[in-house]
């Protein structure tokens, strides 16, 4: 692939999509056409036009991928390879992402509608994260045959009469179903640890936006991942359902909506297979009146509008102390109404003046699809009909060129005095919509923050460190940011495990805990001879 610059057009992106990896399934180490020969269109969110057709795999193609994986698993060479050696191959895949960031960023700009520079920045993070996963191969090797302290007087327990060690074995064949909002990042966050752990993995990207994920098949082929160890099958929900339902799939890792996650749990229950689910959120931004108001504005916009609000950790509930509510809302409205719309995410002609410095959120990108656009507008119509105040926004931007383009644009919207039991407060909208409630005391702030079934992330802003800590410790969420400045909001570090409470998920991603999700813990008991003897004669 040749590099693509920020000045390129949708037509030039299409030229890159003529590569085999973007037009065929990757099964058994080879690029193959779908058995039924079907395709599915993908649209450019800025205009609504179809710019490419993906291969549409079905249950039969999933069956082919599973047969290839079963052959590779039965061979045993991959599972028995040192994890550090598997990590070396994953590191080379990460390097391949790094070397093709400009191409992949342009593809994601076209596929998802996110600004090119944001896509490039995030993909750089995927490459770095892949290198981290690769480094954990050596850590996993070091964990093998680790002696267990079985008592020895601890707690009054006598030591065992035999030697015991722990091992971490790969699970087997794992199904990986990734989301559309950060396509390659979410996919590689599953693929990399699954492979380092020694599993055979089948990736099913989102049918809404999964083009960049298909490049992982090419990378796997280029670096020499053995045939059948990794496959990529694009398709619709039925394709994903076939992967989940297969008795040969011992674990499913999914990122997406809580509704789909619950269906995956239900489908996995009869075979008692494992699941790791990173699901929806309705994250709270709690702002105390001792917070610098300008920093509060910046943090609120970044928390709500990053990736157009299409991020599971989006802070779409603003819980603000009564003393600064009116001032904060006025400033938010003033800023939101000045942010330009990104009519062409690939070229990014509209960059914004960045006078208010909110990081990546200096343009309003389109939402990903017509169905998502319709869904968000439907929510807003329902909220207005229910009497919820639309403080700003609430519909399609009144710009002639945006309306003419057919793009999927939504005005950044603030809903005020939102009832706690309303859908505006309780449901994940997955768009640029912020719901607002106020509080007077710490106890009220905590109650408001914990007033939904979700628990993925939250932020507490205060200039008082002790207060920020007290409140953060009582919020039920997998990742809480306690800050006086808003810096680091939404940040992720590969070494820091995170996940959801409640309806936001099961299991953890990132860190050593994220790697362990793809392993089984086994104890091996030795008696009659020592562990050292066994290793010496192995």
Which role does the model predict for each range below?
Residues 50-57, 74-78, 175-176, 285-288, ...:
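Short, well-ordered beta-strand elements within core beta-sheets of diverse protein domains
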Residues 73, 77, 94-101, 105, ...:
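Structural signal for hydrophobic packing residues in well-ordered secondary-structure cores
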Residues 259-419, 482, 533-534:
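ALDH superfamily catalytic-core signature
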Residues 47-53, 249, 402-405, 409-538:
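Conserved C-terminal structural/oligomerization subdomain of aldehyde/semialdehyde dehydrogenase
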Residues 48, 86, 108, 198, ...:
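Residue-level signal for inorganic ion chemistry
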Residues 143-295, 439:
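Rossmann-like NAD(P) dinucleotide-binding subdomain of oxidoreductase/dehydrogenase enzymes
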Residues 51-143, 147:
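Glycine-rich loop-to-alpha-helix module at the N-terminal edge of alpha/beta enzyme cores
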Residues 1-47, 72:
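Hydrophobic face of amphipathic alpha-helices that form TPR/SEL1-like repeat modules
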